[in-house]
């Protein structure tokens, strides 16, 4: 007689609860948590879909859900036990936005989970709040802009009030609304074909043969937006290094730097290696790329990705890029500084960032970015190119950093560039707007170190 030792597979709702707890209470990242869960449990396709829908859905609607809980609860939302708050959000999201799910299933499953993760008093509270919602569900109307503009926008766009206030003041209400709306769209999968293993034209044909609908990205010869059949990429294509999942905007800095075969290149803040491997592929695996990052485990990830993609020109090492390294002064033809930043351009797929950042946090980044750019400038050869990029839309981390740098460094000049579908740079600087690019928000600046005359 044989006995199965297979671990029981929890329901999608139970796993969604755990994922949300890790993200909201332990500062984990949603994409990493979901990857771990999917690697651990053999879920059916419909369970995977429900799990991801619940996790990302709750994070996208978090403000709205907490507001409703506040209307229903006799206790202040902030004082509720985290397990209670998360279970209520999980249930209310299903009741409000997933109409195909029966109300009884959403409520009963949450009560069942509550019995496993908290004490009987909290179980009764969860059950009571949800039953109360079902009685009053048609009475929860978001205030109009005329009644309370800031609350209306915070609940409609599910962004923190301080960010709505800051961006509406900076860009005007219409532009800010368009950006916030874009952040709440579910992002399409975009991939970069590895030309070292398969030319882009051949890969497009392969996609078509497998019934995968894909559209080329106009400004990226090796880039494709996957319209349908994305599940194929979590098999052969990625494991064999034929393609790499990367946002379209994230591919732009390397495109603008435009490294050539035989050149020496530095990627100063390289992990996880997406731009590093992209540059190596652009160089045809000829030349040399030094890839730095602060943490050894991230260096291991760069090496792993390079090996999988068949790249031999990347030399990755742990370095504190804020510390001077005279040995490599004016060594490189091209330098990419994709600087650490507030991440306020990637709120569509790193949804939780909006709930973690504060206005005060934004003050931490410019001093670091300025220090890194000062070091980057030393490593570029005369006549060489330096690209500075971030994945934020905060001008103090973008235009202000580059403008101040150019004022202090007359040996550098901005170089204008143009990309199909994204427009032209101004004074060597380009902001990629998520509402226009249907991708992440990014900032890219291209500078040249003048040759001595």
Label each residue range with its predicted role:
Residues 1-453:
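S-adenosylmethionine
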């Amino acid at each position: 007689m044989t006995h199965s030792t297979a671990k029981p597979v929890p329901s999608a709702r139970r796993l969604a609860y755990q994922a949300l707890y890790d993200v909201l209470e332990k500062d984990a990242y949603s994409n990493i948590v979901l990857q771990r869960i999917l690697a651990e449990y053999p879920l059916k396709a419909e369970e995977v879909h429900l799990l991801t829908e619940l996790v990302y859905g709750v994070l996208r609607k978090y403000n709205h859900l907490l507001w409703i809980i506040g209307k229903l609860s006799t206790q202040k939302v902030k004082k509720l036990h985290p397990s209670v708050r998360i279970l209520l959000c999980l249930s209310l999201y299903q009741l409000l936005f997933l109409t195909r799910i029966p109300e009884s299933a959403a409520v009963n499953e949450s009560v069942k989970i509550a019995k496993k993760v908290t004490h009987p008093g909290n179980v009764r509270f969860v059950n009571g709040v949800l039953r109360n919602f079902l009685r009053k569900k048609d009475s929860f109307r978001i205030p109009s802009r005329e009644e309370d503009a800031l609350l209306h926008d915070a609940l409609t766009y599910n962004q923190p009030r301080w960010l709505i206030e800051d961006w509406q003041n900076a860009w005007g209400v219409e532009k800010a609304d368009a950006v916030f709306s874009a952040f709440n769209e579910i992002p399409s999968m975009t991939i970069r074909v590895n030309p070292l293993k398969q030319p882009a034209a051949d890969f497009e044909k392969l996609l078509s043969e497998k019934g995968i609908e894909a559209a080329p990205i106009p400004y990226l010869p090796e880039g494709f937006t996957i319209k349908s059949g994305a599940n194929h990429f979590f098999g052969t294509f990625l494991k064999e290094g034929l393609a790499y999942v990367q946002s379209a905007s994230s591919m732009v800095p390397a495109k603008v730097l435009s490294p050539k075969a035989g050149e020496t290149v530095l990627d100063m803040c390289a992990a996880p290696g997406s731009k590093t491997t992209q540059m190596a592929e652009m160089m045809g695996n000829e030349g040399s790329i030094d890839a730095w990052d602060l943490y050894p485990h991230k260096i291991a990830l760069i090496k792993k990705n390079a090996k999988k993609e068949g790249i031999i020109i990347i030399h990755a090492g742990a370095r504190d890029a804020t510390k001077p390294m005279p040995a490599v002064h004016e060594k490189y033809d091209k330098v990419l500084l994709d600087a650490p930043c507030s991440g306020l351009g990637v709120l569509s797929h790193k949804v939780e960032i909006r709930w973690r950042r504060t206005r005060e946090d934004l003050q931490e980044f410019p001093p670091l970015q300025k220090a890194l750019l000062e070091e980057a400038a030393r490593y570029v050869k005369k006549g060489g190119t330096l690209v500075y990029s971030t994945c934020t839309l905060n001008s103090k981390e973008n235009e202000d950093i580059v403008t101040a740098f150019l004022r202090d460094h007359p040996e550098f000049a901005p170089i204008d560039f143009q990309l199909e579908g994204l427009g032209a740079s101004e004074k060597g600087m380009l902001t990629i707007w998520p509402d226009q690019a249907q991708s992440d928000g990014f900032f890219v600046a291209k500078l040249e170190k003048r040759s001595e005359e």
